[in-house]
């Protein structure tokens, strides 16, 4: 939908309706969509979808991709879904419907293994309510633009399918985002780190008077740290190590990797190496975000 209201351009975001069988993988699908930058809302009553779409369309492009989960947990409200989708189309909104399903046998097994109760099950008859749900969803399945059967699909394989179908820029969407962060050990290790590297073994510029009040963002400090043979050797090994790890992390479906590099105060050595590692990884085509946590503490 692209319209002009009061001289203001209103553009439609990419709107994805996620629905399907309970236990078929909607939660995993939504997590993958969130990694792709989608604004996700779970269990939204169908009657609210048009109003939500209108609000998002008036966000001036701040929200470009939206995924709304609509399923039988909505109870009586769910029966409005088909009518609402029809109205969305009539109003000019662009939307897609992703339907996730699995075989009865697979769904029964998943519920047995998870020990969770099916939303429609009040009497312990899992197979019966699965079949009832399949019938309730028959019409909306017919409106689906994409159906994924997850019977023999792992979580990582499902994520790959979601990325392929909805990632837009597939090359960028499927690449790990590497955050390299410097820190000072005196202030603690970043709690969300995946890899922690202690570079306090390197010569400390703090003890050189003319470098003490500078940081690893300043060229004199960078030249001093990077001129050391031990630093050069360490960086070579570190870059090889990271390049070895990244494909394995991606294969496991990891979306982000945080590498924390620490020195005593988080001002000189760690900042220099964080900048250098970020620069080299960017040149090699990785998606990189560089941060300095403690550089302003002094």
From Swiss-Prot:
Give the keywords, sorted: ATP-binding, GTP-binding, Nucleotide-binding
- Work out whether the entry's keyword set contains GTP-binding: yes
* Residues binding GTP, per UniProt: 71-74
Q: Which is a Pfam family this sequence falls into?
A: RapZ-like_N
Q: Which InterPro entries match?
A: P-loop_NTPase, RapZ-like, RapZ-like_N, RapZ_C
Q: Which GO terms describe its molecular function?
A: ATP binding; GTP binding
**Residues engaged in binding ATP:** 20-27
What family is it from?
Answer: Belongs to the RapZ-like family.
Spell out the HAMAP family in the cross-references: RapZ_like
Purpose: Displays ATPase and GTPase activities.
What protein is this chain from? Nucleotide-binding protein Dred_3054
